């Protein structure tokens, strides 16, 4: 009994002490926690680091106190971060979020057929294969030790480690690695294509804006030229009036009656000659009466601000070679010939629908047509505002666009201005010496016009007077040239025009005929001086270079001839017959019976294809449509197709 009572008393005395221990420890810990925060706050406000003791600051003192075991479990890492951010005036939520600029480059979630670990293993394997580390003698020794330490029991089972199974496992592993490499490269290529498409889209938008700016620039440049012309006319009229007051009355009366006073003797002849020359000349428009009297004044005031000649072509430097710039439907039938003055300038097109149309290339605006030919135009050339056209009606017509020769195709206006039975003819001059259809012509920069017809003659014209200067006769040349008299024309090409191609350079004229011969004529003597033999089909196009002659033929080839030796230095084979070719700064554009025009760089032997992209907003071309005529100037290429469409490419 005594022992039991003593045990119960001891237990009753221990119970209160054990129950008070957690309460005392919890209270003490709570007090110490609050006191620690108070001390830290006081230290933060009353102590600061000094240059002498930079290590003594509130943060260092507080962190030093955290090393006490009694406080470590109370102040966790998250509580310290919250305390630090709250005492530095930073919002904890804002400090834990990433800024928006860092979130912009996060790619969208995409499903891939390989994991990150697989991709890393493949790339790491490739890197180890491409740049293996050198094995030293110590590594070789360690390798031998490792090989000798392999447990023999691991390879004792012949059923698992047969040579065939090992080879199969290696091949499977290698195939998996190659598959992953293929997927990685395909993914990278798709990413590159996506970036390129975005860049191309941006580039196209910038080019569209630049084109609009260029059109506005052309419009305001035209307005500026009109205003300057009015200013010059006004100043010239004032000068003429002041000049007339200085004349005696007899001289004025003589001038009114048609007699030329002495003061006008020299100028009258000069201006009369200028008027006759400028009526057709492509160099300058016809001046007004006031301008005739004071032409010297115009020459002295030629320093008026003018638009640069290459202003229109500033856009073309930003295009990629072979890219489509514009496309439009010009005619309803086969385009026989086309030419343009300069990029974003005037474009003239001729077709078998018996129309010749003039366009503004800047905005693809139809300006009007040239009326006068009774049959379709087979060839044409344009220089500035001057156009020469050769037709199957045996005539050559000259047009000066500054003389308002364009027909607006207005039925009401046409019925009022001309009788129904009388054809409209707005040509400035008509050349009628040929007796057969005109099939080729060439217009040089020094105002030399050469035409060729089925009457087997080539004629040189004075474009001012409209007279034929000389005639180059092929019949006479064939009878006196024994080397070319034996060449026969195939029955396949007997219906083709006798002369399809002409070009001139200074006093030299190159002619290409249906028999595949190229003759070089000297205009000073009117005779052929050399013949280039090599083509086996009709010549379709010719163009001179400074030292070479480029020829295209129906024999599916383009030849480059050396003018000094007369031999071909290069032959470019084509898949089909060549319809037209043009050369610009060492790049040759060739239009054949293939769907697209090809550009060949004669220096670097590179080539491009001028194709129309499927995603473009261009018109739908006929399946069998081929380019029939091409022109190439100032990095811009224009081709006309058999379906009547016209395409403009950067080249």
UniProtKB/Swiss-Prot annotation:
GO terms for cellular component: cytoplasmic side of mitochondrial outer membrane; mitochondrion. Involved in mitochondrial fission. Acts as an adapter protein required to form mitochondrial fission complexes. Formation of these complexes is required to promote constriction and fission of the mitochondrial compartment at a late step in mitochondrial division. It is a peripheral membrane protein. It comes from Schizosaccharomyces pombe (strain 972 / ATCC 24843) (Fission yeast). CDD domains: WD40 (cd00200). Residues 195-229 form a coiled coil. Transmembrane segments: none annotated. This is Mitochondrial division protein 1.
């Amino acid at each position: 009994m005594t022992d039991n009572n003593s045990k119960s008393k001891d237990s009753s005395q221990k119970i209160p002490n054990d129950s008070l221990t957690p309460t005392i420890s919890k209270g003490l810990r709570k007090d110490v926690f609050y006191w620690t925060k108070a001390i830290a706050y006081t230290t933060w406000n009353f102590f600061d680091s000094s240059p002498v003791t930079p290590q003594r600051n509130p943060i260092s003192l507080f962190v030093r106190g955290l090393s006490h075991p009694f406080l470590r479990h109370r102040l966790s890492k998250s509580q310290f971060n919250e305390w630090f951010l709250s005492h530095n005036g930073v919002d904890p939520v804002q400090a834990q979020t990433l800024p928006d600029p860092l979130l912009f480059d996060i790619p969208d979630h995409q499903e891939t057929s390989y994991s990150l670990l697989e991709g890393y293993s493949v790339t790491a394997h490739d890197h180890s294969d491409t740049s293996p580390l050198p094995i030293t003698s110590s590594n070789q020794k360690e390798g031998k030790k490792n090989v000798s330490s392999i447990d023999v029991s691991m390879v004792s089972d012949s059923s698992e480690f047969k040579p065939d199974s090992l080879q199969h496992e290696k091949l499977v592993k290698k195939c998996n690695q190659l598959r992953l490499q293929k997927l990685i490269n395909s993914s990278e290529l798709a990413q590159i294509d996506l970036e390129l498409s975005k860049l191309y889209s941006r580039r196209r938008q910038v080019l569209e804006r630049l084109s609009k700016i260029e059109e506005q620039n052309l419009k305001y440049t035209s307005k500026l030229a009109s205003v300057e012309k009015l200013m010059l006319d006004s100043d010239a009229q004032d000068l003429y009036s002041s000049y007339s007051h200085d004349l005696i009355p007899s001289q004025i009366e003589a001038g009114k009656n048609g007699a030329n006073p002495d003061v006008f003797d020299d100028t009258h002849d000069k201006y009369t000659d200028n008027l006759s020359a400028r009526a057709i000349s492509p160099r300058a428009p016809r001046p007004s009466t006031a301008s005739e009297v004071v032409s010297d004044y115009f020459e002295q005031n030629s320093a008026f601000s003018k638009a640069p000649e290459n202003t229109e072509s500033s856009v073309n430097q930003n295009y990629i070679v072979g890219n489509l710039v514009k496309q439009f439907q010009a005619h309803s039938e086969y385009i026989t010939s086309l030419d343009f003055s300069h990029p974003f300038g005037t474009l003239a097109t001729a077709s078998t629908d018996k129309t010749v149309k003039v366009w503004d290339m800047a905005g693809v605006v139809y300006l009007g047509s040239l009326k006068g030919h009774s049959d379709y135009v087979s060839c044409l050339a344009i220089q500035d505002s001057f156009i020469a056209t050769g037709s199957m009606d045996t005539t050559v017509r000259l047009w000066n666009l500054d003389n308002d020769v364009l027909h607006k195709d207005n039925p009401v206006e046409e019925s009022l201005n001309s009788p129904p039975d009388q054809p409209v003819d707005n040509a400035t001059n008509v050349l009628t010496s040929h007796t057969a259809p005109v099939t080729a012509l060439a217009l040089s920069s020094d105002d030399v016009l050469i035409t060729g017809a089925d009457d087997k003659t080539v004629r040189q014209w004075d474009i001012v007077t409209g007279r034929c200067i000389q005639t180059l006769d092929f019949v006479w040349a064939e009878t006196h040239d024994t080397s070319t008299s034996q060449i026969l024309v195939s029955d396949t090409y007997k219906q083709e025009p006798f002369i399809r191609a002409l070009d001139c350079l200074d006093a030299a004229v190159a002619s290409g005929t249906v028999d595949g011969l190229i003759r070089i004529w000297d205009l000073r003597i009117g005779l052929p001086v050399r013949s280039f033999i090599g083509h086996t089909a009709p010549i379709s196009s010719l163009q001179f270079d400074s030292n070479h002659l480029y020829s295209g033929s129906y024999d599916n080839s383009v030849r480059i001839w050396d003018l000094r030796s007369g031999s071909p230095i290069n032959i470019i084979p084509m898949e089909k017959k060549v319809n037209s070719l043009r050369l610009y700064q060492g790049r040759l554009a060739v239009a054949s019976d293939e769907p697209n025009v090809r550009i060949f760089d004669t220096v670097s032997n590179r080539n491009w294809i001028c194709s129309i992209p499927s995603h473009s907003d261009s018109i739908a071309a006929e399946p069998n449509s081929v380019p029939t005529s091409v022109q190439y100037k100032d990095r811009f290429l224009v081709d006309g197709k058999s379906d009547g469409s016209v395409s403009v490419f950067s080249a």
